[in-house]
């Protein structure tokens, strides 16, 4: 591996870097804002000084081994996003990165469609394209439409405090909030660690324009009337520790939700987060706040017509949908086929599969081991499927520990069985259930010992089965059962 080439600064594309760099310390190549965000992350892990980094401008190329990689300007829900044209001895492979076609971006230039067309005219072996919105017809709206929505909201809510939750990385969104705040004479407070860090980085690098005296510290809010304040905060996905969730739960140290507050969710729930977002909305509504969660967000990913445009400009021989769940990849494959790319030239890949490409053929030739490496506290990779399964089991049904003492020489029962439970039932209110469970274990243990079983693993298995059978019969639950046998000399 010669280097990491990063298309943009979203967490799902850069979050693993500090952990991977500890294993293979190789250079990072990316654009200015993306590098600034990465450097913040490397500082947290004390890796900044020892990591080689090179900032690349759109239109520039880098050389890695036999490959030349060109960075192409695109649009996305974070600034400085890039597509990659990878020039290899076998041909050119274009990777769109996460992208949309935005003809009127808030900051910088529109996607460089001309460069895509120029590369397409010279011949492209394969196109790897963003599949996130491949099921959606039409075009993705411009980010500027959200600014129009913000302007309407600010105009209609001039007598209330505004709290806006959005993705920390969406600098364009933050810029439009600041623009509206300045227009309507409001001070802006930024809350949430990730939000503060990215806004600070974007401002320092010239990607965010903040009028003088517009941003204030959260401790200065008390110096201004609520209707002259707007808070930009994290927590748009209902994350339990994010700033907005803590406000909703009345555990935020600096902000208390008031009945006349207006809260705007400038995001759509990521699949899987719907319940968390709904919980926060309900908590905020119960406090009397007005919650707005419609028409204040647009996607950063291309819909079908934008995908068709890129396919038409690039004219690839092979199509490789990327970045999405299987159904998204399949929808993207359908777009490619609708434009005349033969079915046998469209590849929906599984993680780990190795695709061999040349002008004459393309085929899957191997599969390498892949999978999730989980980070838990200071541990990296030490939590696997078995541990996750046990945690899920504990979360759903709790745990019962059966403790008994046997004489070492004869296996005679000296004490117990005692039962300790957590997360199953409240013992003081279920004494009869626990007493009967002890009897069930004692009877099973007595049969086992009469059969002269001396293998403690066998005895533990008998105890576990007896407890499981009894608890299921009485409660229709399956808590985790752990037998503990202590032996003593008498």
Where do the PLM segments sit?
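Hard-cation-handling environments
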Residues: 136-452, 460-461, 465
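Broad gene-expression machinery/nucleic-acid interaction feature
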Residues: 66, 81-83, 399-401, 481-483
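A general secondary-structure junction signal
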Residues: 57, 192, 350, 485-488
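Conserved beta-strand scaffold positions in the cores of enzyme catalytic domains, especially
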Residues: 53-55, 126-128, 263, 291, ...
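C-terminal tails and terminal domains of large nucleic-acid-associated
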Residues: 452-460, 464-490
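Conserved hydrophobic residues forming the short capping helix/wall of the S-adenosyl-L-methionine
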Residues: 42, 336, 471
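Short, low-complexity Ser/Thr-rich regulatory SLiMs
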Residues: 73, 404-408, 488
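His/Asp/Glu-rich metal-coordinating catalytic cores
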Residues: 1-5, 10-223, 242-256, 275-278
